């Protein structure tokens, strides 16, 4: 393999555009793959702007060889639309880094990647699509990966970029902590409000109660998380910019399908599996499912 792996990226949305721009900044521009042939990608951040030249390829038949590293940055609701891309871009020597929410990426993707190794990740930076189709990166980019041999390929690819990459020997705990953060974001969908809503005392109390329910499930699944985690997560939302959104709220406001199952339904599913009461999930999950899928 050359000094740096051949790289493709599927899904140039907010997270995908961020990773593509960071790689482009150091002359490792990935092959861009998606549904729409955008002529370019634009990332804005505190220090300026990065323009990644396109076009975004929208036909898997235009490529005829696998890549060393594939970043998969589509939402889990869009994975079914990516099967042709995964079959084209992957073989048994490929590492697929899933830049996705949830704790089930490996199980969900392994049957689709043509023998490649699936590497889950935790994405720690907020990036949001703007009305002009650019992406606004609102914090320093950071990824956490499991400390396994295939992670080295991602570390090598992102070395020298603005994105910090951390390896964790207890990735299960890290992934579940991020899932708790994502889960409580579901409350924003039902209120149709951004992070400012967490400054309300009643919402903060509801969020804490829900996060404690989530914490019990996370621990049953093997996560080692302190009792302080629910309050820490609420504090993050409380002190965030009032206009900070989350991807599931953006999807609801755009009338797109929601990742309700992998962000919230998973708590209910594993709770029932372990015999853990999930009274808040039992109300929240059907409402999120209905918001996503209707009818009505």
Language-model-detected regions and their locations in the chain:
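Helix-loop-beta segment of a Rossmann-like dinucleotide-binding subdomain
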Residues: 133-143, 190-198, 244-254
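A structural signal for isolated positions on well-ordered beta-strands in alpha/beta enzyme cores
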Residues: 8, 31, 95-97, 144, ...
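NAD(P)+-binding Rossmann beta1-loop-alpha1 motif at the extreme N-terminus of oxidoreductases
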Residues: 1-53
